[in-house]
Every structure is written in C-alpha cells, then in structure tokens.
Amino acid sequence: MCIRDSDGTTTEYPAVDFSTVGVKAVDDHTLTYTLNFDFPGFLSLLSYAPYEPAYGPLLEEFADQFCTSAETACSCGAFYLAEYTPLENWVMKKNPENYDADSVYIDTVRYIYNQEELISGPEMVKRGEIDQATISSDILDSWLADDTTKDMVSMERPETGKSYFYIFNFLPYRHEFSNWTVTGVDAQYEPDNWAKAINSTNFRRAFLYAINPSVTLAVTAPEGYDNYKLHTITPPSFCANSKGVDYTECGGLANLSDFFDEAKAKEYRDAAVEELTAAGVTFPIKIQYPYNPAVVDWDKQCQVFKQQVEAVLNDGFDFISIIITQGPSDNFLNAVRRVGAYQLMSYYWGADYSDPETEVYPFYQEAGDRGT
C-alpha cells in the first residue's frame, strides 16, 4: 500500500490484515472495540469529540473542513438547539431522533442570561427568581446565622474533573509566536530580576514548601476544605484503575500529602538568597499576581495567599513582594494569561476524558502551539 505525502512523495507500507484491527462493526448501530491493555477510561474517551461517530456522507462532502464550524458538523445528541439569542437566552429541545430518546424525560431546557445575577445573585435566590448563586465569604456568616437562609446554603461538591495549581511565568518578556503574541510583564515588575529568580530551583522550592493550601481554601470552603485539597495534578475520584482503586491511591501517589513546611521553605529561601545574590538579583523580588474580578472570592484568596506566603518567606529577610493586580472581568484568559501578563497565577485545567494523562497537557507544549 502506498500513501502520498504532502510534498508529493509516496511511502510504501505493508498491507494490514483487517482481521487484526481492534474495531469491528457488528451491525448498523454497534461497534466492538478490542483493547490490548487495561484502560478504565476508555468509555469516557469515546464521548470525547474526536472519537464521536462521524456521518459518512457529510465527511465525504466537507473533507478536511468537516467539523470546523457549526455548519459543517453533524451530531445526534439528546437535545438540539432550538433557539439562541446572544446575551438573552437559548433553548434546548428534546431530540426525537436520538437513539435513546425514550430515556430522555425532559422536553425543554431553557437558559436565560441574567446580568444582574453576577451582582445580586444571593438576593435573587431569596426572592425565588433564580435557583442558585455563589455566596461570597463576605456574607456567608450572616446567611448561616439567619434562620430564614441557613438551610439554603450548601457547599459545592469537589470538582473532580479539574485540577487546580499555581503557575510561574518563566519567560516574562514580549515574544512573537507564529500564531500568537506574548506581551510579557510591565517594566515596573522588574522582569529581568524575576527571570533570574524563577529559573532558580532553590527559589521555586522555597515557594513549594511555603504555601499552606488550607489557608486559601478556607476562604471559599470555611465549613470544611479537606475534600478540596489536591496532592497531585490528578484530582481524587477522577479515575480509577481496572480494580477500582482511585488513581491517587495507586503506587507512590498514595503517600503524597501537603508540602507545607516552614523550616524547609526557609532553608531553600536562604540557599536561593546566596545563589541569586551572586547572580545580581535584588531583593525583595517583585511578583505580579493577577486575579479575575468576575470570579467570586478570587481577590480574597490572593490577599490571604500573599499574607501567608510572605509571612513565611520574609521572616528574617525581605525576600519577596507579591503585588496583587486586578485583571479584566471579560476576556481574562486572552488579556492576562495567554499574553504572559503575570509572574505568578492561580490556574486550573479541565480534563477531556477520564485518563490521568490528560491532566499533564498544561505542562508541555507542542511545536507551534500557543499554549493554554
């Protein structure tokens, strides 16, 4: 079998016996997959967009433009989009053509855009205008103390599909990628000084051991935050092995716990001071730490983080100065994170399917990829 490459050359490959292929069409509506290793996340993988069945005639018609827009895609889910008005509402209707339509018991789902909810959501819940809202830490105590509202309050379940962590900017300068421009941090945050510091292993380890996650988690989960702690990039209850053991309890992961250790933090800080002083770094090292004002309590988490970490690392030496900055409430991703307008930032990643490998995507970058 010969395959023509994009440069016009051809490559010859040996013929493949189709009986060895691990995918079989049993009938018009059934595929059988045969795996050559245990993969507990395989079923969730099949629900990921690239693995959804493709409608053959449409694929042939659009070729490499297939699924590049709403007009070139085709699917047959439980609901279809019946109405859509930007910044007003959208309506989903039950799809009678779905293969399992008899098991869909809701006929219509209506989403209504409500700008007011971002500002006065809790009061709208009181009035019965909306079903739920996020309560900021400013009013949580008063709601819990009020007999008319205390039973309305409940903690959100831990988000098992997302991993939360802190990220550093190792290249705080303007840089032109083929498909993206990184502006970097402003001169007032001393990017040259920062670049030397962040590329020091001792500096980064000082941060690792200085962060007490319980302090920042207590801002948004004062009723109990142990279930929200992460000790690795894979959240608990996200996936399990073929024997049903949670991935975070497998192998060496089972022994991971909080890294917070003041003595170790100061040990690495002192080593970093000696190393960085020799490299010409000036202290305190400025660290821009932006937040999105549209996210409830993010600003308060930043304040608590700053106080807690500086209390550890600045004990006995003026080591760092964390400078909290407010980003835009709209388009924060492109305006701050993707253009590198930060030195330290809180970050999260949502996996595409139940495989721990998907949690590592933010930590590497394909050639030509602008990053996340």
Q: What residues fall within each predicted segment?
A:
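Gly/Pro-rich hinge or "lid" segments in bacterial periplasmic/extracellular proteins
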Residues: 8-12, 16-19, 29, 35-110
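Periplasmic binding protein-like
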Residues: 125-126, 130-135, 147-153, 308-372
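Append "and occasionally in soluble cytosolic enzymes with long acidic Gly/Pro-rich linkers
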Residues: 93, 194-313
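Short, small-residue-biased leader/transition segments that mark boundaries at the very start
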Residues: 1-3, 92
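Ligand-site clamp/hinge motif
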Residues: 48, 97-144, 160
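Short, well-ordered beta-strand elements
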Residues: 31, 77-79, 90-91, 107-112, ...
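A bilobed periplasmic-binding-protein/Venus flytrap-type ligand-binding module shared by bacterial periplasmic
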Residues: 93-97, 115, 162-202, 219
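Extracytoplasmic/peripheral linker and loop segments enriched in polar/acidic and small residues
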Residues: 4-19, 196-205, 209, 213, ...
